């Protein structure tokens, strides 16, 4: 316990003397990759409610959906619903790429908003297997326009399910990372459909263009010796390093103390940290590719027409899917699917459509938006940060550091989020 | 028409029978021949990560699925009922009580591993929490700086050089390995031996019923303390991630570095 306090104290105090003077922002972790992996130390998070009224929703979004036996456990789209007893505004929250409705970051946002008196419904990312299986019309995720339509349908079903139980004064919307970009497209769709009339829309660390952000994440894997195709060797090496550190460090268990020690002792180099982030991303992407391939019977990694039973080994598919890059998915699977339906669609035009720029007129004109971003977020370029500034003006809140989502749970960031939805 | 009826029939089967696999439902697509996928394993020359010896994967996956259904229809409803009728304060005291009983297991295994300081610490914890902590319901020992060291016979075997052996998913207990399953049996044997020697209810004719009640509540409490839910991540390769995390955590905590 004392060790833990000491470590946290080091973590918080050490970088401060140099930083406090210039920007007055208290989030302590300076490195972009390090912040992304470490997130926010618990003492720097806001106080969350001890108890919440919360329940799981399992939604039948697409009636009579046939699910392959390998996904026997998937009983519908899973959303988390936190509700107030009195009349309150309802906020929908969308998870980032590959994340479920219960991802830690999403649940933290939910808790902070619940604390401030909101009803909240969290949704998994359209790139999460549960969404692909239960809520994606095409089964092919990643297109902002189609994902927004799927999300909108899911939100309508969720609302129908709970509207008898709660009183709602208004609707708002939020999302982080890819979920933030999707939130923008959902809001735009809502201007036509008018089911919710979203009052406020918050985008936390959005990519400006999904394609270029994916390129930047793939770049991280290039820092691995031998590149992404040797990620298995790299991972196993990092694992030995991790184990040895534990073994000689006299730790009691794999817990926060241990993880902070990894950071404070700089166990992994900057490049290795980058590689680990890239690998995490690939592991997520693999789940999406596999789920999509099975649902559409496309013969991409699973033989076409093979029916996987619930006890079949997926080991080889796991290895294959984790070795496929975003470019493989995009060029061999994703773009061809859209090109088949729209033969005149060029690749450039398609990439451009996966961007906030494609709806910038709308984003600029609507006062309901705000974007939170970090100067050192590696999924966006300096130019893209400037673009967000220019697009949203005063409604863009740019922090000097935090990496990608590392500072999302920092109390100042959470306070900004809550105030935005309140005002 | 045949297909439609078939699908309907499949969906009407009561949920419990889903524990058996569903080859019947799949018949519609199986008629068409399989085709080679665009990407297959032969393309990649790389080590597998998250790899663990798992020769009984078919059995393990069946058990993994069994545990999912057992949780869903038996275990979790009981745990939820327990959490509903028992105030949070009482739940914490009950957990403390059982965690304190498990210190006996921690102590015997620290001693088996000839770890002097750790054994003394654990003994100190057990004595402190049993007395000042009112039978373990409270944990003053941690405040006095006596950290908990979880030990079991599987770790003892590992400490003395036994490798984990193949991965094994046990019914109800969940992820384990051949070595840890043996360890589990030994730990149960030792507790049973101690229990018989101590004989806490010598004059009661209901001794058996009382001890059955205590171990049932212990099982419920253990599940209550364990937040893991089968398939909750929704990640299609969850089985491998769980297998990997279980295995590595055990390897690391046993004090052995993984094999290159």
Residue positions per predicted region:
Chain B
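Post-signal-peptide N-terminal segment of Sec-exported extracytoplasmic proteins
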Residues: 44-76
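Bacterial N-terminal signal peptides that target proteins for export
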Residues: 2-13
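Membrane interface segments of multi-pass transport proteins and intramembrane proteases
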Residues: 73, 78-89
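Mid-length scaffold segments of soluble, non-membrane domains
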Residues: 96-178
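Hydrophobic helical h-region of N-terminal Sec-dependent signal peptides
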Residues: 14-18
